[in-house]
Regions:
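Extracytosolic ligand-binding ectodomains
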Residues: 2-8, 24-32, 36-47, 51-52, ...
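N-terminal signal peptide c-region/cleavage motif recognized by signal peptidases
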Residues: 16-19
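Internal, well-ordered alpha/beta segment that forms a basic, Gly-enriched binding/recognition surface
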Residues: 11-13
Length: 458
């Protein structure tokens, strides 16, 4: 197992060289070496040549390589045999729909996955997407142990890729689902291809435009800032009825949170909730006047930056030291999840709620196990990013593969069809008009004063 996943990194590197030719990664088996196995015997067992086996497993090319019991080997398809049979697409009765009804799942139930992302080490985009891809592969391995078979095809699709060449690959038409692309200009051609061939397209990261509304086969995971603000305001108003709201002007000229606080104020006025506005530079006495002594207070800053949060916490410490029993909760921003090493104690102290579409919990047992396996297989830690890209790929693959395995073409990713508890990145889709599916998953991460933590999903 460990050796196999180390090999994946080598394959990602090989993709750089093969991208122009549109070559894909494809394999038929992950094989665990047994005590009496030989290289010749393994090759013969799977009807491949020794050279094909060695080429698929770069570690075997080292002069000091020795086959050992427990090694995991990538078994490629024979060079003369296609990975899967090609089913030619035919026109549908409704030509205007342009969505093929001839795409069929593999007879044995195997879920065929395509990954069309920049899988290279040239820049940060490629490095992040390689990590996402690793997460997809780890999910496939995990699902295999549960009896869910997968075939994975991967294409290196950098920013300047010839997308037409990629989708012309016969293997692309065999996919049940494709994850990608990363870049906006690649969405329409790949989306049109998926629509024509009845393939689901999962767009995992931020793009511009509204392609999801035009393509019923697309799944847009990323939520725009406007969508997230709307969800956050809805959750705020629902949860904090009967509270007094205190909005703190932090004098941050670089902040983009003014859109949130402006719309929050409009909503509060609409529902008749009282609020006060104070300033971070005000005196302690003036700052205290903004708070209610009879109602619980909810404090909202108009910036997500750490320095202003730190200054606000200092103000709150002074306030609560001289006003015992004052009820205070903090309502923050997703960025605050990056500051947990510094402010966790304060989050608990001030009953903090953080709105987000993901939550990375480094103390969760399943998360620890996946990170440990990642470290063993790839000899490196996951990138220190929020969200973790490998966990994102793991969650996305688990969600969609499980759904396709259980529901087949009836799967659309709604909350009612969810069969997976995520490590970090929950998904919940809703159709956009007559178009595709938009992720609407949203949660509040709540740091409770009793030093426990809960996630509240909406």
């Amino acid at each position: 197992m460990r050796r196999y996943f180390r090999l994946i990194l080598c394959f990602c590197a090989l993709l750089i060289a093969t991208a122009v030719a549109g070559q894909t990664i494809k394999w038929q088996e992950l094989y665990k070496v047994k005590k009496k196995d030989t290289i010749y015997g393994i090759a013969k067992k799977f009807n491949i040549t020794i050279d094909e086996l060695i080429r698929a497993n770069p570690a075997m090319q080292k002069a000091d390589y020795a086959l050992q019991k427990g090694d995991q080997l990538l078994i490629p398809y024979p060079a003369t045999k296609p990975a899967t049979a090609t089913t030619p697409a035919t026109k549908t009765a409704n030509a205007s729909a342009q969505c093929s009804t001839t795409h069929k799942r593999a007879a044995d139930g195997t879920v065929r996955i395509g990954v069309m992302l920049p899988l290279h080490n040239v820049d940060g985009d490629g490095q992040r997407m390689v990590e996402y891809y690793r997460g997809v592969l780890m999910a496939c391995d995990s699902l295999r142990s549960q009896g869910i078979a997968t075939h994975v095809y991967a294409w290196n699709v950098p920013i300047d890729a010839n997308v037409q060449q990629t989708i012309n690959d016969d293997n692309a038409r065999q996919c049940d689902i494709i994850f990608g692309p990363l870049y906006t200009k690649q969405v329409k051609p790949i989306g049109d291809f998926c629509r024509k061939n009845g393939i689901r397209l999962v767009i995992p990261f931020s793009i511009n435009g509204n392609d999801v509304a035009q393509n019923e086969r697309s799944y847009q995971v990323f939520q725009t800032p406007a969508q997230q603000n709307e969800a956050s305001i809805n959750a705020f108003v629902q949860r904090f009825k009967g509270r007094h709201i205190v909005i703190v002007d932090c004098n941050d000229t670089t902040s983009r949170k003014g859109v949130f606080t402006f719309n929050l104020r409009k909503r509060l006025e609409k529902v008749g909730t009282t609020y006060s506005i104070t300033n971070l530079k005000s005196t302690d006495a003036s700052f205290a006047k903004a708070f209610s002594t009879t109602l619980p207070n909810v404090v909202v800053l108009n910036t997500g930056r750490s320095p202003e949060l730190n200054a606000t916490l200092a103000k709150l410490n002074t306030l609560t030291a001289t006003n015992k029993g004052l009820g205070i909760s903090l309502y923050g921003y997703t960025e605050w999840l990056m500051y947990t090493k510094v402010y966790t104690d304060y989050y608990y102290k001030y009953d903090t709620y953080i709105p987000t579409t993901f939550y990375y919990n480094p103390f969760a047992g399943k998360t620890i196990a996946v990170e440990r396996n990642y470290r063993q297989w790839f000899k490196s830690d996951m990138r220190q990013a929020l969200p973790r890209f490998a966990l994102t790929g793991f969650d996305h693959a688990q969600f969609f593969i499980r759904g396709l395995h259980k529901y087949g073409d009836r799967f659309n990713g709604t909350q009612q069809q969810n069969t997976y508890t995520p490590l970090q990145t929950p998904l919940k889709f809703k159709r956009v008009g007559t178009g595709g599916m938009q992720n609407e998953s949203f949660m509040l991460v709540h740091y409770k004063p009793n030093r426990t933590l809960e996630s509240i999903s909406y």
